[in-house]
């Protein structure tokens, strides 16, 4: 009967009957007290259930769950984007695509535009994770000390340009504003990371020594600039161990000694600008084998100038610089308070003259021709390391000091008199690490050295002249028209004027090399490749009691006419000029009173001894090492060796123009 009632009753009645059966079982097992409590709780539960039963027989729990389902479906319906939201999103996408299309078009147009200026980078930058590039995938990555050609400004955050390396195409370069913002964001993240780590951890040893370097090196993807290039790591690695001690000590934080130890870290955070403006074409500067102004050095460099003039005809400007451009340090030119100190010092060149020369070199480089400087006062790479010229330093090297000694002595008594100062200068160059030079020419034969230098410059030419920008440069004809050199000594003398006008003549014409003629033999040089910045300038160096004339002093009494005319007529007789030159120099320097007469005697005896000494020098120099292959920083792959175009002279055998 119970089963019949259950089958006829609704499901809720069956549930109630089942509960009653359970209660009966509990009454049989539970004690009286527990039975009363269970009955009371059952009664209350039954009343609650009856009170929340729905009209359809469902309980309150069912009703609640159903209401949740209905509410969720309503919410999901109302969260769908409206028509206005969809149209707004489409408009944004259309604007983004249009901006990208315009940026791509501007990028294409910039390929044929001339280079506006060039910069050398002081930081590294990776575009791998950049998401705000005007054209995705077109940002340019670079390392510190790379060179960039900038075509134009795209917006406040991006420039258009290219990396000066063969095979690199035009793209977007982050502007200094963008790099500075990235640097600040990165520093802020580093500080926050250090703060949170010091709060959460009890170990204070990582607060300065470990957290800061690691947070810098694990740069978040959104921060692509490499802050390590600013040199902070070097200072942090020097922090003493007691500042990394895990023992928290008040003295270690507040003592003056601790503050002194931390100061270098904060001083280093004086950020270097991300870019330095440099000439569009890096000027080539020759140094070595010894001091300029002496016959051996001048003869070897003159042979290279002649070769370059013929090899790169139409693509090269060779210009003479008489001002002391080593004074053109950025810290001096940008700081007016230092100008008076330089002006009061005993220098040959005024700052105005130096500044004018620097501007002229920049203007020559805008033509994107190769620029070669015959710089009178530059004898060491350190002299130009802090200037804005970023030169290609070519080291003309004689590996054996004995060979250099023989060469100097073979030039006569006037040169042997200054043997010591020349040997000291050569030794200082030999002590420089190879990284200070871009090219080291240490070959025994002139033609090998010339081809080595030509290979490097050909690679540099290709790096600065990509196929996509092969249009003629409108600046070229204008610059060359204002910088041409007179072709004869007569024209040179008419255009130059007196010695007093020499230093104020700012035309400093581009030099034509002399006609290639065979002449006597002097020797050699070996050469390879590298870069610049080391010991102090020594063009005015003195060694013990034997004091040699530096190039700087010698040119004080030499006329511009005698220098320029010698480039055109290398075989003319210089005896009268040199006698006058040394006579006037005795007024300058009383310690060299016998210089003029010894030079005259040297002119008479030099030709008699040259043939014998030449053969001895040649045999000894041939024992030197064979040529090292240059590592070309402008080629991404090994370039082909350019076929040799031999000059008329086959060795370092030219009796070229000698500057004393």
UniProtKB/Swiss-Prot annotation:
The residue ranges of the SH3 domain are 114-183
Query: What are the Basic and acidic residues biased-composition ranges?
Result: 560-602, 610-623, 632-641
Q: Where is this site: Required for CaMK2D-binding?
A: 549
Describe how it is modified after translation. Regulated through phosphorylation at Thr-554 by CaMK2D.
Q: Where in the cell is it found?
A: Cell membrane, Sarcolemma
Q: Output compositional bias ranges, type Low complexity.
A: 55-65, 197-209, 486-495
Spell out the molecular function terms from Gene Ontology.
Answer: actin filament binding; calcium channel activity; voltage-gated calcium channel activity; voltage-gated calcium channel activity involved in regulation of presynaptic cytosolic calcium levels
Query: Which portions of the sequence form the region Disordered?
Result: 39-101, 190-261, 486-641
Q: What keywords are assigned to this protein? A: Brugada syndrome, Calcium, Calcium channel, Calcium transport, Cell membrane, Disease variant, Ion channel, Ion transport, Membrane, Phosphoprotein, SH3 domain, Transport, Voltage-gated channel
Topology within the bilayer = Peripheral membrane protein
**Cellular component GO terms held in the UniProt record:** L-type voltage-gated calcium channel complex; photoreceptor ribbon synapse; plasma membrane; presynapse; voltage-gated calcium channel complex
Q: Name one Pfam family in it.
A: Guanylate_kin
What ranges does the record list as Polar residues composition bias? 66-85
Tell me the domain of life: Eukaryota
Result of mutating residue 374 to A? Reduces binding to RRAD
Task: Give tissue specificity per the record.
Answer: Expressed in all tissues.
Main location group:
membrane
Q: Which residues carry this modification: Phosphothreonine?
A: 554
Residues found modified as Phosphoserine: 204, 207, 218, 550
Q: What does this protein do?
A: Beta subunit of voltage-dependent calcium channels which contributes to the function of the calcium channel by increasing peak calcium current. Plays a role in shifting voltage dependencies of activation and inactivation of the channel. May modulate G protein inhibition. May contribute to beta-adrenergic augmentation of Ca(2+) influx in cardiomyocytes, thereby regulating increases in heart rate and contractile force. Involved in membrane targeting of the alpha-1 subunit CACNA1C.
* Disease / disorder: Brugada syndrome 4: A heart disease characterized by the association of Brugada syndrome with shortened QT intervals. Brugada syndrome is a tachyarrhythmia characterized by right bundle branch block and ST segment elevation on an electrocardiogram (ECG). It can cause the ventricles to beat so fast that the blood is prevented from circulating efficiently in the body. When this situation occurs, the individual will faint and may die in a few minutes if the heart is not reset.
Q: Which family does it belong to?
A: Belongs to the calcium channel beta subunit family.
Q: Describe its assembly.
A: Component of a calcium channel complex consisting of a pore-forming alpha subunit (CACNA1S) and the ancillary subunits CACNB1 or CACNB2, CACNG1 and CACNA2D1. The channel complex contains alpha, beta, gamma and delta subunits in a 1:1:1:1 ratio, i.e. it contains either CACNB1 or CACNB2. Interacts with CACNA1C. Interacts with RRAD; interaction may be involved in beta-adrenergic regulation of heart rate and contractile force. Interaction with RRAD regulates the trafficking of CACNA1C to the cell membrane. Interacts with TMIGD2. Interacts with CAMK2D. Interacts with CBARP. Interacts with CAMK2A.
PANTHER family associated with the record: VOLTAGE-DEPENDENT CALCIUM CHANNEL BETA SUBUNIT (PTHR11824)
Descriptive protein name? Voltage-dependent L-type calcium channel subunit beta-2
Name the gene for this chain: CACNB2
């Amino acid at each position: 009967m119970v089963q019949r009632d259950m089958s006829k009753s609704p499901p809720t009645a069956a549930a109630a009957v089942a509960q009653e059966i359970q209660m009966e079982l509990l009454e049989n097992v539970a004690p009286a007290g527990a039975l009363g409590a269970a009955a009371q709780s059952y009664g209350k539960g039954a009343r609650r259930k009856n009170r929340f039963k729905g009209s359809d027989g469902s309980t309150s729990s069912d009703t609640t769950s159903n209401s949740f389902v209905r509410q969720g479906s309503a919410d999901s319906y109302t969260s769908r984007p409206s028509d206005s939201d969809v149209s707004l999103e489409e408009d944004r996408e259309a604007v983004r695509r249009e901006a990208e299309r315009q940026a791509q078009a501007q990028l294409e147009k910039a390929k044929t535009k001339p280079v506006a200026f060039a910069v050398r980078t002081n930081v590294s930058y990776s575009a791998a994770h950049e998401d705000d590039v005007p054209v995705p995938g077109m940002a340019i990555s670079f390392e510190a000390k790379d060179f960039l050609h900038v075509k134009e400004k795209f917006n406040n955050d991006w420039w258009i340009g290219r990396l000066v390396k063969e095979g690199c195409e035009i793209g977007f370069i982050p502007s200094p504003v963008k790099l500075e913002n990235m640097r600040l964001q990165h520093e802020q993240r580093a500080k926050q990371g250090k703060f949170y780590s010091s709060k959460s951890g009890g170990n204070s040893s990582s607060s300065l020594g470990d957290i800061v370097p690691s947070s810098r090196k694990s740069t978040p993807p959104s921060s692509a600039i490499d802050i390590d290039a600013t040199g902070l790591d070097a200072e942090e690695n020097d922090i003493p161990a007691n500042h990394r001690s895990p023992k928290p000590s008040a003295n270690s934080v507040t003592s003056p000694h601790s503050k002194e130890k931390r100061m270098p870290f904060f001083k280093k955070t004086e950020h270097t600008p991300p870019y330095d403006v440099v000439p569009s074409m890096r000027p080539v500067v020759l140094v070595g084998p010894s001091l300029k102004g002496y016959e051996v050095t001048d003869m070897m460099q003159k042979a290279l100038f002649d070769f370059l003039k013929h090899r790169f005809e139409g693509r090269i400007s060779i210009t003479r610089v008489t001002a002391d451009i080593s004074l053109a340090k950025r810290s001096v030119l940008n700081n007016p308070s230092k100008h008076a100190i330089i002006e009061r010092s005993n220098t040959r060149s005024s700052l105005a003259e130096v500044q004018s020369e620097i501007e002229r070199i920049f203007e020559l480089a805008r033509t994107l021709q190769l620029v070669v400087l015959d710089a009178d006062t530059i004898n060491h790479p350190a002299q130009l390391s802090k200037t804005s010229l970023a030169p290609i330093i070519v080291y003309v090297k004689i590996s054996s000091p004995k060979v250099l000694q023989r060469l100097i002595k073979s030039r006569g008594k006037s040169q042997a008199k200054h043997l010591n100062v020349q040997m000291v200068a050569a030794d200082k160059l030999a002590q420089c690490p190879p990284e200070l030079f871009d090219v080291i020419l240490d070959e025994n034969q002139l033609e090998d050295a010339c081809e080595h230098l030509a290979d490097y410059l050909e690679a540099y030419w290709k790096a600065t002249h990509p196929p996509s920008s092969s249009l003629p440069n409108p600046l070229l004809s204008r610059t060359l028209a204002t910088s041409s050199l007179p072709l004869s000594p007569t024209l040179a003398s008419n255009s130059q004027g007196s010695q007093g006008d020499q230093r104020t003549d700012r035309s400093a014409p581009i030099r034509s090399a002399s006609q290639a003629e065979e002449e006597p033999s002097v020797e050699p040089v070996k050469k390879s490749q590298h870069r610049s910045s080391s010991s102090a300038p020594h063009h005015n160096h003195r060694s013990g009691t034997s004091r040699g004339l530096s190039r700087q002093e010698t040119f004080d009494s030499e006329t511009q006419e005698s220098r320029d005319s010698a480039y055109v007529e290398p075989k003319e007789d210089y005896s009268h000029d040199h006698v006058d030159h040394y006579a006037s120099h005795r007024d300058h320097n009383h310690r060299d009173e016998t210089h003029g007469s010894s030079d005259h005697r040297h002119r008479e005896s030099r030709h008699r001894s040259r043939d014998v000494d030449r053969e001895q020098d040649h045999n000894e120099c041939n024992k030197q090492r064979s040529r090292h292959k240059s590592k070309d920083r402008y080629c991404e792959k090994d370039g082909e060796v350019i076929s040799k175009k031999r000059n008329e002279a086959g060795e370092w055998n030219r009796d070229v123009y000698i500057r004393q």
